[in-house]
Amino acid sequence: MTTIRNHYQNNQERNNMSNMLEKARKYETEKIAATDPQTKPLFHVSAPTGWINDPNGFSFYDGQIHLFYQYHPYNREWGPMHWGHSVTCDMIHWEQLPAALAPDEEYDKAGCFSGSAIEADGKHVLVYTGVTRIKQPDGSEQYRQNQCIAFGDGK
């Protein structure tokens, strides 16, 4: 099943970002403000808070190297994966950007899992696996994986 996801195509849509993504970004901002910079690595990508998982979407876009990664911002244990976002020009000094993806749609509500990033038609395009849980007649749950596409503004 292919699902098209259309994030942040212009500034107007950016103002209408999902509640989950807005919540994650606000939480990141609060945690970053409360974190002593001396506790963070100088030359290594790290999440602003929570659990960090797989690197994804390593790409060159708009003159910078972008690295996305799965992470759960609300806990230091595994949970519904979001995509964090960092950029660099030299592969040594990394700048943390706001979260890029949050599990906020029916097709990815159990998490935004592994994927890639490319540039297409001047847009940064994220292709990832969205995961949902499907309740079975016997009461058990089964995971369904959906291929998703997010079109970003590169910020």
Tell me what each language-model feature is.
Residues 8-155:
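Beta-rich carbohydrate-recognition and catalytic domains
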